[in-house]
Each structure stands twice: as structure tokens, then as C-alpha cells.
Swiss-Prot record:
It is a single-pass membrane protein. This is Failed axon connections homolog. Belongs to the FAX family. It is found in: Membrane. Keywords: Membrane, Transmembrane, Transmembrane helix. Its main location: membrane. The keyword Transferase does not apply. The gene is FAXC. Pfam families: FAXC_N, GST_C_6, GST_N_4. The chain crosses the membrane at residues 68-88. It comes from Homo sapiens.
Length: 409
């Protein structure tokens, strides 16, 4: 069977798919700073009777060929106009006037909010700061080729560090106001360790060593009957990009065993820094918690059977408890099939074993969401329960939980 492969785009573009070239569309997984160079879809289609079709066209008179070509052109034009109308409609629906629009990748199909540590970091930060926002899963990268990025009052900002600085300036939120100069310096140093070093070891485990499991979690819209093929193409292109970017970073020049040794050192450092504290920097939330959670959650819930998962759920159990604590508090709709009873009491374990898809709120506000849940489900909150009524195994939630959000107002 012959197969045809094409690239469909609604705008002019030039795509070089030679042996030594990579598609920049997938640079987000490797943290690439390259600008997004084209938009569209890779389409594969079977040519079951290739010779017969060509022979049939060749025997037709010229006027029939003209009709075929004209009809094809009209269909292509109609498809193009329909696409542009849908794009315009979407753009009209996401007006960012006085609203935070969070652009990120589509939810994976395993119930985890995102396979990208930075997307999960950014959305968790918005929930920690209690800032209402609207998700947009269009997949379009920012002008800098980054994901996630936000729109607010028609201003566009990319890069999680710059987004947080922007929101602090525009909206007056500050999760770090309880930190002194010395603590802020430690927080920044740990952030750089996590985002510039630990991240690459996770990317290796996720997109190189554990690629088959990651492919099962990846969600692609619009693939139709070729979704599995597209998923395979995306994952293997991403694998090549990750390996290339890791080599440029330097960490990719080491062996697999050495990369995992570096990962374990980073995880042990985080476990030692956390100790028995509620959050990384103490009893109060800070921006660092969104960063650390966004990365540790990948090891906790997206890398089944791997060394980082075994480490975080075994020897470094305080990191697992930390992840569960943040998940339950700021992601009440996120439940997982393999919830482990070691992190909870018998009373709460039964309810948490049921998988519930993540809700894509039109506008998400943590305060409003919990108020609605309280009114509908009549949860009674005690010092041993979180805002969803689940009992917490380590008595993390106490009577001053609501004050965690007051620090950023």
C-alpha cells in the first residue's frame, strides 16, 4: 500500500524535513527558546489504488479534468474558510479583558493536569494565589516559542518567571512576602536547581527512557483514525529534540546511569530541604512550592515503575506526602486510579480510588469552587479534613489553612 504524507496549514510556510532537521513545533518539551516557525498538522493518508486513480484521470477528456481540479479547489477553499471562521470564533471567545487566559497543552489522558512541569507549575501557582483564570488548550506557542503563556488585558507574557513577575506587578499578589532576603536567595537557588538541572533528568526519563508509557498518556486532538500514528510521530520527534537539547546543555553527554545519579541527588536535596515542614520554605506557601510540585508531580504520577517513582514513593516518602498535600488542597477535582493508601487514612482511601476527569472550568477560582462544593455537598471541615472533606493522613491541614491565601492579597 502507498501512503501519502502532507502538511496542512492555514498560512504560507516553508518546512524543511531533511535528515538533520527537527520540527520546531515540538521544541516545548525540551525547553527550546526557538521561535515557533509554522502552524499546522501532519497528515498521513492511504493511497489504496494509486495507479488506477492516475490512469483514470489520464483517460478523461480535458473538460472533466478541469471539473475535477475546480471541484478540488472549491473544497480546499471551503475547508480553509471554515478553519479561519473557527479560529476567529475562538479568538472572540477568549477576550482577555480583565481576565487571565492561560495557554497550555491539552490535558493528558491519564488524569494528570499536564505532562509539562512548567504548565503544571503555572496553573498550580494561579490556584495558590487564588487568581481566577481561563484555560485555553489551543497548543499555540508564544512568540518566543514558549509554553505556557498568558494573556491579561490583551498583554501577552511567556516564561513562568516573567509571568509571575507580571502578575505580581499588575495584581499585587505575592506568595513570597513572608520570606526574608536570605530565604528569597535560597528559594531562587532551589528554583534554578529544579528548573535548570532536575528538569532535564525528568525529561530524559519521560521522553527517552520511558517513551512508550509517555506515548500512552499523550492526548492529541484532531488525529482521527491516525491519532496513534501522530502520537508515535510526536513522541519520537520529541525524543530526538530532548536528546539534542540535553547534549547542548551538557547533561546529555553523560551515561544513563550518571543521569539518574544526578536526578537522585536533586531529589535527595529537595527531601532534605523539606524535612518535616509543611512547605519547602516553612509553614507558609511560596512560589517555590508551585515550582517543586510541578516537577515532582511528574515523578509521582507520570513515570510508573521508573526509578524516580520508586524513590519518591519509597525512601523519600516526605516528598510523596508533600505532593499529596498540595494535590488535595489545590486540585480537589484531581483523583488518581493508583492512589496509595499509605498517603491517606482508610476513610478517605475508598473515595479517592475512583478516577474523576479534570474539570476544565470556564473560569477557575479556588475560593468560589470550594464555596460551591460546600453548598452542594455540605462538607464539614475539621482540623483533620481538607476543603473537599477528605481526611488527611498526616494532619497537615489545620485551622489556619485559609490564611495561606491571605499572604498574597
Amino acid at each position: 500500500m502507498h501512503w501519502g504524507v502532507g502538511f496542512a496549514s492555514s498560512r504560507p510556510c516553508v518546512v524543511d524535513l531533511s535528515w538533520n532537521q527537527s520540527i520546531s513545533f515540538f521544541g516545548w518539551w525540551a525547553g527550546s527558546e526557538e521561535p515557533f516557525s509554522f502552524y499546522g498538522d501532519i497528515i498521513a493518508f492511504p493511497l489504496q489504488d494509486y495507479g488506477g486513480i492516475m490512469a483514470g484521470l489520464g483517460s478523461d477528456p480535458w473538460w472533466k479534468k478541469t471539473l475535477y481540479l475546480t471541484g478540488g479547489a472549491l473544497l480546499a477553499a471551503a475547508a480553509y474558510l471554515l478553519h479561519e471562521l473557527l479560529v476567529i470564533r475562538k479568538q472572540q471567545e477568549i477576550d482577555s479583558k480583565d481576565a487571565i487566559i492561560l495557554h497550555q497543552f491539552a490535558r493528558p489522558n491519564n488524569g494528570v493536569p499536564s505532562l509539562s512541569p512548567f504548565c503544571l507549575k503555572m496553573e498550580t501557582y494561579l490556584r495558590m494565589a487564588d487568581l481566577p483564570y481561563q484555560n485555553y488548550f489551543g497548543g499555540k506557542l508564544s512568540a518566543q516559542g514558549k509554553m505556557p503563556w498568558i494573556e491579561y488585558n490583551h498583554e501577552k507574557v511567556s516564561g513562568t518567571e516573567f509571568i509571575i513577575d507580571f502578575l505580581e506587578e499588575k495584581l499585587g499578589v505575592n506568595l513570597n512576602k513572608n520570606l526574608g532576603p536570605h530565604e528569597r536567595a535560597i528559594s531562587r537557588a532551589v528554583t534554578k536547581m529544579v528548573e535548570e538541572h532536575f528538569y532535564w533528568t525528568l525529561a530524559y526519563c519521560q521522553w527517552v527512557d520511558n517513551l512508550n508509557e509517555t506515548r500512552k498518556m499523550l492526548s492529541l486532538s484532531g488525529g482521527g483514525p491516525f491519532s496513534n500514528l501522530l502520537r508515535w510521530v510526536v513522541c519520537h520527534i520529541t525524543k530526538g529534540i530532548v536528546k539534542r537539547e540535553m547534549h547542548g546543555h551538557g547533561i546529555g553527554r553523560f551515561s544513563e546511569e550518571e543521569i539518574y545519579m544526578l536526578m537522585e541527588k536533586d531529589m535527595r536535596s529537595l527531601a532534605g530541604l523539606l524535612g518535616d515542614k509543611k512547605y519547602i520554605m516553612g509553614p507558609k506557601l511560596s512560589t517555590l512550592d508551585a515550582t517543586v510540585f510541578g516537577h515532582l508531580a511528574q515523578a509521582m504520577w507520570t513515570l510508573p515503575g521508573t526509578r524516580p517513582e520508586r524513590l519518591i514513593k519509597g525512601e523519600l516518602i516526605n516528598l510523596a506526602m508533600y505532593c499529596e498535600r498540595i494535590r488535595r488542597k489545590f486540585w480537589p477535582e484531581w483523583h488518581h486510579d493508583d492512589d496509595n493508601t499509605i498517603y491517606e487514612s482508610e476513610e478517605s482511601s475508598e473515595g479517592s480510588k475512583t478516577h474523576t476527569p479534570l474539570l476544565d472550568f470556564s473560569f477557575y477560582s479556588r475560593t468560589e469552587t470550594f464555596e460551591d462544593e460546600g453548598a452542594e455537598n455540605s462538607f464539614s471541615r475539621t482540623p483533620d479534613t481538607d476543603f473537599t472533606g477528605h481526611s488527611l493522613f498526616d494532619s497537615d491541614v489545620d485551622m489556619d489553612d485559609y490564611t495561606d491565601h491571605e499572604q498574597c492579597k
